[in-house]
Amino acid sequence: MKSETRFQILVSVAALGMSMLTGYAASQTPSNTLASPDSFASISDTGTRSAAMFTELGKVLTNPRCTNCHPAGDRPHQTDASRLHQPPVARGPDGHGTETMRCSICHGNANFDPGRMPGHPEWHLAPREMAWEGKSIAEICAQITDPARNGGRKVEDLIHHIGEDTLVGWAWHPGYGRSPAPGTQKEAGALVEAWVKTGAACPAK
């Protein structure tokens, strides 16, 4: 084998190996961290790269900090184990509770760690059309990209909602006794923005 041919083969093998390692690093990040959009640069197909970034974001969307307030029914869940809220409460007509049991009766403007009580000025449940408790990442993606099932929202709206909304941001600062969502809000926002800019493709499963 000529030295030039041998060199070309070695270069090709090395490039393939680096590509595989980069893809592995992006898809195998620990469950409590988030890969950056740059981690997916080795995926040449734009749609595949976009779907891969949403899959990474799915670590946040399927975390109890999110699913507890995006329930399939009208009762929120609580704790890392996603138990039904105690005392029993209901969504109510506006997501802020019933007339006699408003969320704000117990949930103040900020976390109250001595009582393990989470809080935020706008504490409430997500709208019914944004319920994704028990759904796969692919099903969540299909739902939030469909205006008929997401309250008429554009995918671009998610850049601000996930990346900057302070109630969503609570998920990364949930207070005593609760595990935060993976990564940081800034990292999640960067993934959403990159996902939208690459076509907002959904994973197949």
For each feature predicted by the language model, list its residue ranges.
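C-type cytochrome heme-c attachment and multiheme electron-transfer modules
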Residues: T48, T55, P64, N111, ...
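Detector for methionine-enriched segments
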Residues: M1, M18-M20, M53, M101, ...
